[in-house]
Amino acid sequence: MENLEHRVAESRTEQIQIVMPGYTNGNGRLFGGKLVAWMDVVAAVTARRHAHRDVTTVSIDNLQFKKAAYANDTVLLIGQITHVGVTSMEVRVEAFVERLDGSKELVNRAYFTLVALDSHERPTP
């Protein structure tokens, strides 16, 4: 079990994005789809680090847009394994706006289920 816990801790992934004007709607808020795409990449990297295999996203659960991110905001995305099954993994991804003073405000959270794939793109342990 210690080995699994160690691998889970090592799989933690962080990504930083700056919200560019082209990523926003007419009110200057980040498009939700753009944020979800960033979150999906973080979930995939987290799962790949854990499984040491290619992965694919199966589902996204409990996607919660809590606050808006605006043009020129810095967005910090953090992925962490929360559950490991036989072939699947659950990854929690949280997105924060990071202010210039270093404070962070949660803007989104979702749980991604990903499956590890073998060389024939079939689910594998």
Predicted region positions:
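Hot-dog-fold acyl-thioester-processing enzymes
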Residues: E2-S59, V115-P125
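HotDog/MaoC-like acyl-thioester-processing domains
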Residues: N3-Q15, Y70-A71, T82-P125
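Hydrophobic aliphatic residue packing
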Residues: I18-V19, R29, M39, V75, ...
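A contiguous binding-surface segment within folded domains or other stable secondary-structure elements
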Residues: V42-E98
